[in-house]
């Protein structure tokens, strides 16, 4: 206590004779005040004045340094999980246990947004239901963008919050949901990616007719990437051809995650009226306007009793494979109670070993409420999930974040959005409390920012709040940052890993039709790039054209349309361009001498070595030096590496990126006055370009995993279409429709939607997802290279 008193006293007094002492004391007091109860510190400050005056400053400096060390140790002790748990009030523990951060994700048109609308209605968040393509023209609440309502698709993920009152054994508990509705189209996959990065659980929606589809597999991959537990909801049970058990089989076989139904349907297709709960063996139906009332009966329809017993046994057997407690009971031939089954499902789901499958029809207002109960029962609260940060003071050692309000603040900015009131930054609070007016530090650049306003989002509406606790999701105004930035209150040297951002696969040139729109065009482009990491822009040095890149035709079309609507900028766009890559297939040696004299100091550099395929990583490049004897000094070798990187940005064949190349420098020569970093950088670039043709330089084209769904009667027409475009990988034929999966060159898919509409009378649909790069056919490569050389010649002749 005496050293803290010393520090406090010195901080209060005018310690002019020892600036070092004052500095230590100030730090000690600040640390003590932020990590200890305030009263003892104030007491120490008053008492310490009796011990120290200006004449004691040198002694105080030593005492203050000891005080700083002690205060830091005290602060560290207060930040341990045990100390934080001890300070947690029963109210905070209760609040945390009732929070569910969930997302709704699925294939296109599986009913994600319709499910979200029912969740909002049944939780009382909205007073009326508006359909995605409803006749009232209002559109779904979660599709707030005009383009979304016109096209009937979700383009941006939308966040909201709601309270769900769950009744169990006559006791009502209120759960708090933070809900994010995500797009289904692959072009907007970054929206799903960043949602999964910050969510604790998800509802994976499947179509009862189609089951697991192409985008379902993509969503599954994203959930696994971020270790997100999920429950599965088989939607559209009232459709003709619905088969929930086929969907369960497909989850097991295609997604490779153990799954079992926890419900079976009462009635099928148009006769679907509810579900049988296999855990409690009871029937659940919906009554009243929009299915607002849930009617539970302990009497199961007679014709379903045998099926219910069979599916319940299958559920227990599947749980025995993934849960030790149920496995032990199964071996002892004991029947688990409903409580034991629910506990096992929760353990296995949170442990990423299992997904329970529920079923219903959101559009028909049936069996959505039991799915909400399942979210409460089986998906984790923020305290059940291991969210990790990287401690930058310990070489980015992983450290677990704890969702306690009393700990230092750590949050992740996962989405940026332009708003009439300024930039809106969505933040997931992992640890600590975020308060209005609080100062935070951006871990990426150590910039200090103030939080002037905190809101909770309800699609495009907002509600102001003064503070947000640990485990919650909110949005803030007035914070300049990038998507994926970590924020702390300055007491912890933590950063967090960002989300995965896929490479763009398509580009096109764009320019405003009117020169007067240049400022608005530039403003829009900066905003779009800030909001969407998959939307990129660059200016081609040779053509001086502005090139935008994205995930597909629809992705870029949407941004061109938003330019017109939101910024009143009409644009001219060029033909879509494929993002080709260049590579090499064999080893080639080089010995290149750069020797230029222009009156003054010249350029001299010689580099010797070879280039070869990068066998370690076909998607990346590698530079290596094996120079002996100091023929090239180290300072120039670094310039050689930089030159190789720059040469790979724009390949010799088409001007596209080079991948899969390994360059080795073994020897070289320098000149006393004419050698420089610039000379060796340029010599390396020229050596690489000269050796590229000898190394079997080739063009790689992107292959797309293409999924086509259409009525079975058009199967022959689509086979003819796809035989011209790519190799067919798989075909699934159902009662009324079929699905074809093929690998196609992106170049061959331009305008495919028009051909598909003609071949299927407008009844077919398709989606594309980048698969991998593969060598382009020789005739295409020859054509592309000739076209590129012709363009270069035309530019040189201008």
UniProtKB/Swiss-Prot annotation:
Transit peptide: 1-24
Domain tr-type G span(s) in chain numbering: 97-383
Entry-linked SUPFAM superfamilies: EF-G C-terminal domain-like, P-loop containing nucleoside triphosphate hydrolases, Ribosomal protein S5 domain 2-like, Translation proteins
Annotated keywords: Elongation factor, GTP-binding, Mitochondrion, Nucleotide-binding, Protein biosynthesis, Transit peptide
UniProt GO molecular function: GTP binding; GTPase activity; translation elongation factor activity
Binding site for GTP: 106-113, 181-185, 235-238
Single Gene Ontology BP annotation: mitochondrial translational elongation
Subcellular location: Mitochondrion
Domain of life (superkingdom): Eukaryota
Gene Ontology cellular-component terms listed: mitochondrion
InterPro entries assigned: EFG_II, EFG_III, EFG_III/V, EFG_IV, EFG_V, EFG_V-like, EFTu-like_2, G_TR_CS
Pfam families: EFG_C, EFG_III, EFG_IV, GTP_EFTU, GTP_EFTU_D2
UniProt-listed Gene3D superfamilies: 3.30.230.10, 3.30.70.240, Elongation Factor G (Translational Gtpase), domain 3, P-loop containing nucleotide triphosphate hydrolases, Translation factors
Pathway the protein acts in: Protein biosynthesis; polypeptide chain elongation
Entry-linked PANTHER family: ELONGATION FACTOR G, MITOCHONDRIAL
Similarity section: Belongs to the TRAFAC class translation factor GTPase superfamily. Classic translation factor GTPase family. EF-G/EF-2 subfamily.
Biological role: Mitochondrial GTPase that catalyzes the GTP-dependent ribosomal translocation step during translation elongation. During this step, the ribosome changes from the pre-translocational (PRE) to the post-translocational (POST) state as the newly formed A-site-bound peptidyl-tRNA and P-site-bound deacylated tRNA move to the P and E sites, respectively. Catalyzes the coordinated movement of the two tRNA molecules, the mRNA and conformational changes in the ribosome.
Protein name from the UniProt record: Elongation factor G, mitochondrial
GN (gene name): MEF1
